């Protein structure tokens, strides 16, 4: 295709950046030996479920303020969140991830808890932005909850005011890594 990865062609590229790293050959040799020996792979059902969960995160929006614009931005073609297996859903019963974005008021807190309770297990929460994380700019207001973690358990915090689409994308990838590492989170 005419693609070269030679660093001499681009003198502005930092050393070690963008280099192609070969996969670990011992891993593939062991995998090939197991398939050749038995004809199939052996794994636990829990590891299989963890792998499947990371590739099919269905999230629901709980956009309360300006952070919701960045949440919409991450679905546009530039970032295309669906290529990571995350797709938006309108119903909490179909979702397993809730992204709380924006200022959570005291009047909205029961609705947040009700939506969280309607989600099926396992369920995960991403708190997006300074207002959702700790009240943000409105922290000292009488009507603002100082962090959505006082209402629902939060798995991933995405900082920023508002956080960029890249930050939310990174937070979702961190949630996928956490699911792979921990499995079904016990609450």
UniProtKB/Swiss-Prot annotation:
InterPro entries: NADH_UbQ_OxRdtase-like_20kDa, NADH_UQ_OxRdtase_20Kd_su
Topological relation to the membrane, as annotated: Peripheral membrane protein
Enzyme Commission no: 7.1.1.-
BP-aspect Gene Ontology terms: aerobic respiration; electron transport coupled proton transport
Record GO cellular component, one term: plasma membrane
Localization (cell): Cell inner membrane
One Gene Ontology molecular-function label: quinone binding
Keywords: 4Fe-4S, Cell inner membrane, Cell membrane, Iron, Iron-sulfur, Membrane, Metal-binding, NAD, Quinone, Translocase, Transport, Ubiquinone
Residue numbers binding [4Fe-4S] cluster: 66-67, 131, 161
Cofactor details (free text): Binds 1 [4Fe-4S] cluster.
Entry superkingdom: Bacteria
Catalytic reactions on record: a quinone + NADH + 5 H(+)(in) = a quinol + NAD(+) + 4 H(+)(out)
Pfam families registered for this protein in UniProt: Oxidored_q6
Principal place of residence: membrane
CC cofactor: [4Fe-4S] cluster
Subunit structure: NDH-1 is composed of 14 different subunits. Subunits NuoB, C, D, E, F, and G constitute the peripheral sector of the complex.
Similarity comment text for this entry: Belongs to the complex I 20 kDa subunit family.
Function: NDH-1 shuttles electrons from NADH, via FMN and iron-sulfur (Fe-S) centers, to quinones in the respiratory chain. Couples the redox reaction to proton translocation (for every two electrons transferred, four hydrogen ions are translocated across the cytoplasmic membrane), and thus conserves the redox energy in a proton gradient.
PANTHER family tied to this protein: NADH DEHYDROGENASE, NADH DEHYDROGENASE [UBIQUINONE] IRON-SULFUR PROTEIN 7, MITOCHONDRIAL
Name of the molecule in the record: NADH-quinone oxidoreductase subunit B
UniProt source species: Rhizorhabdus wittichii (strain DSM 6014 / CCUG 31198 / JCM 15750 / NBRC 105917 / EY 4224 / RW1) (Sphingomonas wittichii)
């Amino acid at each position: 295709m005419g693609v070269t990865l030679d660093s001499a062609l681009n003198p502005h590229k930092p050393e070690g950046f963008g280099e192609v790293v070969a996969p670990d050959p011992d891993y593939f040799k062991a995998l090939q030996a197991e398939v050749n020996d038995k004809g199939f792979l052996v794994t636990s059902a829990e590891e299989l479920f963890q792998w499947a969960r990371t590739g099919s995160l269905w999230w629901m929006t709980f956009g309360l303020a300006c952070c919701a614009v960045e949440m919409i931005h991450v679905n546009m073609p530039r970032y295309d969140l669906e290529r990571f297996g995350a797709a938006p859903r309108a119903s909490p019963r179909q979702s397993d991830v809730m992204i709380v974005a924006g200022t959570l008021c005291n009047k909205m807190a029961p609705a947040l808890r009700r939506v969280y309770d309607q989600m099926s297990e396992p369920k995960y929460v991403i708190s997006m932005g300074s207002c959702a994380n700790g009240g943000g700019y409105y922290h000292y207001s009488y009507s603002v909850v100082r962090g959505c973690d006082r209402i629902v358990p939060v798995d991933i915090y995405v900082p920023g005011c508002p956080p960029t689409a890249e930050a939310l994308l990174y937070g979702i990838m961190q949630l996928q890594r956490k699911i792979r590492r921990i499995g079904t989170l016990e609450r």
